[in-house]
Amino acid sequence: IFRQGVIIKMKKVLLLGGSLFQIPSIETAKKMGYHTIVCDYLPDNPGQHVADEFYSVSTTDKEAVLALARRLSIDGIVCYASDPAAPTAAYVAEQMGFPTSPYASVELLSNKDRFRDFLAKNNFHVPKAKGWAYEEFAQMMEEIHTFTFPVMVKPVDSSGSKGVKKIDDPGQLKAAVDAAMAYSRCKRFIIEEYVEKYGYQIAGDGFSVDGR
């Protein structure tokens, strides 16, 4: 940027993902005066046409994103509307000394089976749940009698309810697990006992500023 003959360096922000739902974050960053850089493995993502720069890098490949961030000397990294990319954003920020939630905490929150185990071990009220690798399907079938149906079958590392199914008997497990695997990068699934909601559900989004 040139102002009165003086070159002012714009700070660079790396945004993970360029889907339609992520365009508002790119536009907002540009309005705030940042040089916007988007990475996404999908070649037809619309965000690349909004950002100042685009690189074809998977947002879930944390080492590749870190290498890109270092090469471009970014000043910040943002993960917006993408749960799978959240661990990458935390990892890169941690490695580069940016303010961030701890990578270990974000990674734990992004894996349903590990998070359920954490909650249970810390005395939170949670439904009966257990995770298995896809190749452990036979072992799961030997243990499924300990669950009360109906149950939920989910990929451990997906979001937006993708690959999630409610089933009423063990005969439906194979199809449900196969459907979950289509949305799991690590090829793991979790089974949880179904909990019926009573009354109203209150939900919202939170954010922190300066650690508060």
Report residues per predicted region.
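A conserved helix-loop-beta module that forms one wall/lid of the active-site cleft
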Residues: E94-G163, P170
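Short acidic-glycine loop/turn motifs at beta-strand connectors
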Residues: S208-R212
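CheY-like receiver
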Residues: L68, E143, A176-A179
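Conserved ATP-binding module of the ATP-grasp superfamily
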Residues: H125-P127, P150-V153, K165-Y198
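ATP-binding N-terminal substructure of ATP-dependent carboxylate-amine bond-forming enzymes
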Residues: G5-S105
